[in-house]
Regions:
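Residues at the starts of beta-strands that form the adenosine-phosphate
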Residues: 32-34, 133-134, 205
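Well-ordered alpha-helical segments embedded in enzymatic catalytic cores
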Residues: 18-22, 94-97, 196
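N-terminal glycine-rich phosphate-binding loop and ensuing alpha1 helix
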Residues: 1-52
């Protein structure tokens, strides 16, 4: 498995890391400021951005004159902040550690291993319209995930375990959060998908944006090939 050699978001699809594909998709909707939570083999991510032009452009190295020329130089309109969130920190703890970087406005949140054709602007507009703390994207997929119990208006009442392909909705991983979400995360050992989301649902502060289009989570080599 490639994930033993590099962080999962840096596994390549079409000669580009899945992280790059996710960022390019967000950028299409005008989201160009990124905060990336680093952990396992974080230097791989840092080196990718430090040498970004080497990965994306044609380059001439003049060894005799110790110089380098970058051809067809294209700069992404991105501002990328890389944060060391710890090697063994759980998902909730990683979110908690970026508190000082996100400001006081709602922010988008996603994982580094999933691709979808979600309308991100519509997702943000839905989040701002209901006034709750958190919005997750609900997708219908026959795989091994916990599922959502939600009302017609998108209000999530609870989570439960999925036993078979019964048409249940799952958290697709594309989310919008208000800073109030940090109050639901205790510390480094907190798993974001457990107590924080469950308590948000219990308090009536968790909503779901339904997505019926493409969605794929790359948990296995087979899913990468798909």
């Amino acid at each position: 498995e490639e994930s033993h050699l590099k962080p999962k978001p840096m596994i390549e699809i079409g000669e580009k890391p899945i992280l790059w594909h996710i960022m390019k998709y967000y950028s299409q909707f005008g989201y160009n400021e990124f905060i990336i939570c680093l952990g396992y083999k974080q230097y791989v991510v840092k080196e990718f951005f430090a040498d970004y032009f080497l990965h994306t452009s044609d380059v001439t190295f003049d060894l005799a004159n110790n110089s380098m020329k970058v051809h067809n130089n294209y700069s992404e309109p991105w501002k990328v902040t890389l944060i060391d969130t710890g090697l063994n920190t759980m998902t909730g703890g990683r979110v908690k550690r970026i508190r000082d970087y996100v400001g006081n406005e709602p922010f988008m949140l996603t994982y580094g291993d999933g691709l979808a054709n979600i309308d991100l602007k519509a997702l943000e507009e839905f989040h701002r319209s209901h006034g709750k703390i958190a919005t997750i994207t609900a997708v219908n997929i026959g795989q091994r995930f916990g599922v959502l119990d939600l009302e017609e208006n998108g209000k999530i009442n609870s989570f439960r375990e999925k036993n078979d392909d019964d048409g249940s909705l799952i958290n697709g991983g594309y989310m919008v959060m208000n800073p109030g979400v940090f109050d639901y995360i205790e510390g480094d050992s907190t798993v974001f998908e457990q107590e924080p989301l469950r308590n948000l649902a219990k308090d009536g502060e968790l909503m779901a944006y339904r997505h019926e289009g493409f969605w794929k989570c790359m948990d296995t080599q087979r899913e990468k090939q798909q």
